[in-house]
């Protein structure tokens, strides 16, 4: 495999593993993260591959614009929108700056970075885009007894990744561009520890397995890849229900709402 991949959140976890996997296959990298020393270590690990470190905070508009400038006129063949942050707090107690950080990193940054590289992919006739989401994107209907995490903004931001991926895939697949929402469960990385959460007792998947599933998901033609879901028809039933609800609408007021 050759080409140029833009990987965000490449300092650790899934992003670092994805960057390492691609570099091992000869793919050049634009590696984005907030920790310069981690990005330099990544570059030193693959001296035979071009690895361009970009230190940027994607929670800020300046950080996003910095990365957009870094990829301007670059022939990006793959984008991995992996950068993430999680703030599990009761909604009424979530500091506004943390809510803004979540939306910036998981909604605004992936949207604008994808917008930046899409015209080039269309012109070149193909590409791959990965939006790293999570199974918690599907947890909206769950009660706090079922899922005790206070997660409203976080779950909503990941649900955005799924919807963006599905609708973009429909729009861009005629141009040879495959868009994938990658939805793991709990992963054995630094991610939750850096948010002050101890999930050491929880069953966790390795970042390596998550990346393996993503790459295999492209081969299988999946738009939503869930590494830990054995029965793929479970997800298909969710999507079929979405389409049934969308198709079941009418301009007439539903009977249950009539007095």
Task: Indicate residue ranges for each PLM-predicted region.
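Conserved glycine-rich cofactor-binding loop
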Residues: 11-12
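Catalytic loop of short-chain dehydrogenase/reductase
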Residues: 130-160, 166, 170-173
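Conserved NAD(P)H cofactor-binding loop of Rossmann-fold oxidoreductase domains
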Residues: 82-88
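A short, exposed helix-loop element centered on a Lys and neighboring polar residues
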Residues: 114-115, 166
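C-terminal helical subdomain
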Residues: 181, 197-237
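Conserved glycine-rich Rossmann-like NAD(P)H-binding loop of the short-chain dehydrogenase/reductase
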Residues: 25-41
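Substrate-binding pocket helix/loop in short-chain dehydrogenase/reductase
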Residues: 90-92, 98-101
